[in-house]
Amino acid sequence: MIEAYFHELWWLLGALFFGVFLGSLTGLIPGFHVNNVALILLALSPGLLELGIPLSAVAAIIVSTGTVHTFLNYIPSALIGAPDGDTALSLLPGHRMLLAGNAARGVAWSARGSQLGLFLSLPLIIVARIAFGPELNWYDGLRDWLPVILLVISLLLLATETTRLDWPKWVQKITGKRLGNDSRLAGFFAATIFFLLAGLYGWAVFELPVDSPVGMPSPSLLLPSLAGLFGIANLLDIYATTSHLPPQKENWDLPPVKPLIAPCFWSAVAGASMGVLPGMTASQATVLVMGGRNVAAKVQGKEGYGMDWETRRLTELSDDELLEIAVAEAEEGYEGPQTKQDLEVIAILSAVNTAVTVMVLGFLYIIGRSRSGATLALKMMYPIETWNSSQPTADFVRLLAVTLAAGIMAMPIMKIVGKGMLRLHAAIPLQSMVMGVIIFVTGLVWLSTGFVGIGVLIVGTILGLMPPRIGIRRSHGMGIILVPIMIYTFAQMADSFGFI
């Protein structure tokens, strides 16, 4: 009995450390997502079982990989400029921290946010079990309203687009200038058009047949589409606008917990809601949390954080002038409202990102539904025993313990990797590094999806270059997932993504 216990414990510890290693790789390599690792392990699971490796250990590898990934994926987003869909919103704040010489501080705030998101989401699992378990069973009622809920949330996300744009001259002429310059309605309209355009792109892409030229298992066009929309497009912008960086301050101290408790708790709540709703991501949850904070601030008579893309102000300054301003602020040690907002956005996004990972694992065992590629792999690997009694299942407790351990281990890893990345910045010219990442991501896309994926990557990149030039948030590109799901659910068709 004791021998069997220690045998299982050793497999679990080995899986934990190997998963932490894989999560570090997926977090740092742009375009290489934990879902790819999960699907590869799923394909290899019969062979691993024959070698004597238990499926519980394979599951622990997947879970620990996903947890560490959510901690470390801020680093390529901010220090290289190659985010995945979940960290799209952190690019601009993280990039501003980098330009101001405060990249280390951004990494520290991200680590604290992920840590709080991990711990604050744990009590929410119990709340979710009560609400969505067999006693109340809210999920059946929620499922009937799912497309309406997704539509309402999408409209709320679009409504938070506060950018003011000019209507085209012909529109102004037709309407007698009732629709004129500096119009918020024009910004909302532009965001809506881009959201729908990304959705149609996603609907077309996910219907395409695709095979890997080298036989990689479960090829998915989600990789090239998201890599184009949020990764390569950002990298090209950075390559064209930034040639050198200021010296970076070695400020790796974690921020105090108390000021971040409230925003990170609501981030965990938003992450929990995103965990049960298919197609919603950490980026959308972050926008909702920041929007909610703005509403609360206005109710209290305070000034909220703006989420505008100040296109007119930016076009008045050249890239060199913007860099000089950032360096000057770094040298003076002045922390303005923009810096405070950037740091809070980084912490909130990291908290949401990690909370979503914890909650999708919880919902897998509460309602038996997968909400990510990793949990889908777990569900396909072996039967999931749902949490129907007062006590959680042993399998769920084991994987939750692995999640906590992986999150604790990820904290010092972030500091070590962040320091190494900044040394790379000092040793390798930024533009050379960016071009190297673009070539690497393109090669990875070809290996996994062939020339079809390359075509999808090119189209996605073109779409991804549009938002900053129009003046809207790039996160509206998540219509690539939301719009197809809403189309399928409203039409009462089978969901080809496996979320419902």
Regions found by a protein language model. Name each.
Residues E8, L12, L16, V20, ...:
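Hydrophobic alpha-helical transmembrane segments of integral membrane proteins
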